[in-house]
């Protein structure tokens, strides 16, 4: 199928989701305008075989694997007592690995920068207005971007979701959070 799109597809958000969408579309020849500020990317990711298949479809599996640590198992311990609770052993035939979010972002940015049909604008969007023909995005500097298609990749508290759902307030904060951490094996 031939790409007949002439105006760029705007992607709001420059995190992992936004960059991945930009690479997928850009690799297919679509013009893409990626708008937003690069986010802070603390922490890490555990990648499963499905995750590596997704990265492979973007041409990034080898680049990510070069920066990742292969996992043979995941050990779950009680944080307060260091008591061993359980262990999940991974089948060696199926790749599991841990990698920092920043390393994933660096690989995504490097790949996106090789695609000439992807344009970056480093700005913060203040308003998203959905119209019948086009969407209008207004930056904090007053710049206006209009597009036939907008992909919202600015997170669950982002403007794209608020524009679609009509919710302008923040969602309630959960009482508990699940977290993953690395702790020295000697502790």
Language-model features, listed with the residues they occupy:
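Charged, low-complexity surface patches
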Residues: 14, 44, 101
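Glycine-rich FAD pyrophosphate-binding loop
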Residues: 26-43
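Conserved N-terminal helical subregion
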Residues: 2-9, 24, 48-165, 169-186
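Conserved Rossmann-like nucleotide-cofactor binding loop
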Residues: 17, 40, 157
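Mobile amphipathic helical/loop "lid" adjacent to a hydrophobic cofactor/ligand pocket
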Residues: 16-17, 28
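Glycine-rich Rossmann-fold phosphate-binding loop(s) that bind the pyrophosphate
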Residues: 13-16, 37
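Conserved hydrophobic helix-helix packing surfaces used for dimerization/oligomerization
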Residues: 9-11, 32
